[in-house]
């Protein structure tokens, strides 16, 4: 084992994508089973994966996944940083292992690492990235991470991370992590509103780092619940089973939370009022100097327009008539939408906005470790 690791280390010094792959790679994976050589093997594997996506793809092709998944069951503190780094590289390229991670409770390993104050913020940011990848468009991952208290942990670390002495990288991934966690998760969104999550994130809209501001806009915009579209039938008349399953998983988790006594529900009027507050908070982002912030603001407002389309259309029609000198009164809103209405100036519907069908740069794009 020692000779094989040394040979692999020599290859790392001189190898590249253009050269033949290392012959020792399958053996190095076997070395992970040896406790005495495990740390050195993991460090060398981390160096190899850091050479680029081609290295990650090669490692996956020779079967690295079951080995590093098994290691998440260990409690050795000296392995934690390098394991989190390796999983960051894997999930940046391949999200297909979401289900296996959740099935084996691998998410708990990263939540504990994230909640370790003695670990440097930059390393905990990698754990936040991994958890964001686990919950990205994955209802089962969202449910189990929420049940493990991920939302409360992320919010509890925001004040220190966003302080002048904090890490902008860490605070950015905390925002992205909670945004992915509660996106289209209605009961968790209700719990977030009731626990003051928007108030904890809103100060980050004035952060000097544009990426942090954009992540904060995304996290706030993800609190706006957009009901799933109707299941579209294909040419054979069969529905999208995956979409039905995802909706059912969230519905089941919502019911379980209610049976457990969690205050996860909001009245429609209260939710509309909370969404109106979010809109007012993020609205200045349309004139932000950063294009990334402006894009995320447009996407968040697009979610709002999707949910309250009738109110937006009514307000836009009123605004056009008022601008042309018609002098017509403000449109009336129903009971469910009245709390959403702006008093006085109707700025939320100031003009026609194009329909937004695409996700934002942060909210909808694929994850990468450099972001």
Where in the sequence are the language-model features?
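Acidic, serine/threonine- and proline-enriched intrinsically disordered linkers and terminal tails
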Residues: 231-266, 307-371
């Amino acid at each position: 084992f020692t000779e094989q690791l040394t040979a692999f280390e020599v290859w790392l010094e001189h190898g590249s994508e253009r050269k033949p792959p290392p012959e020792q790679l399958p053996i190095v994976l076997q070395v992970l089973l040896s406790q005495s050589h495990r740390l050195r093997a993991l460090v060398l594997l981390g160096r190899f994966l850091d050479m680029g996506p081609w290295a990650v793809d090669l490692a996956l092709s020779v079967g690295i996944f079951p080995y590093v998944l098994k290691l998440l069951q260990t409690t050795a503190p000296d392995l934690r940083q390098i394991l989190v780094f390796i999983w960051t590289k894997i999930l940046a390229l391949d999200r297909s292992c979401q289900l296996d991670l959740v099935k084996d409770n691998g998410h708990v390993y990263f939540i504990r690492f994230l909640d370790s104050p003695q670990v440097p913020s930059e390393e905990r940011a990698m754990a936040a990235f991994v958890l964001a990848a686990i919950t990205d468009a994955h209802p089962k991952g969202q449910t189990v991470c929420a049940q493990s208290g991920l939302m409360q942990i992320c919010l509890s670390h925001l004040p220190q991370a966003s302080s002048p002495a904090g890490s902008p990288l860490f605070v950015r991934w905390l925002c992205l992590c909670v945004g992915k966690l509660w996106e289209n998760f209605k009961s968790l969104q209700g719990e977030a509103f009731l626990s003051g999550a928007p108030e904890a994130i809103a100060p980050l809209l004035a952060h000097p780092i544009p990426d942090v501001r954009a992540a904060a806009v995304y996290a706030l915009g993800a609190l706006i619940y957009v009901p799933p579209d109707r299941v579209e039938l294909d040419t054979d008349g069969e529905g999208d089973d995956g979409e039905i399953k995802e909706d059912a998983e969230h519905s089941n988790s919502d019911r379980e939370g209610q049976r457990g006594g969690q205050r996860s529900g909001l009245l429609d009027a209260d939710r509309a009022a909370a969404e109106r507050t979010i809109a007012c908070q993020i609205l200045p982002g349309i004139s932000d100097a950063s294009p990334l912030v402006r894009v995320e603001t447009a996407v968040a407002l697009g979610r709002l327009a999707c949910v309250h389309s009738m109110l937006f259309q009514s307000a836009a029609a009123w605004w056009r008539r008022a601008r042309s000198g018609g002098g017509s009164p403000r449109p009336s809103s129903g009971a469910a939408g009245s709390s959403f209405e702006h008093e006085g100036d109707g700025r939320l519907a100031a003009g026609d906005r194009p329909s937004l069908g695409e996700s934002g740069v942060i909210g909808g794009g694929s994850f990468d470790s450099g972001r």
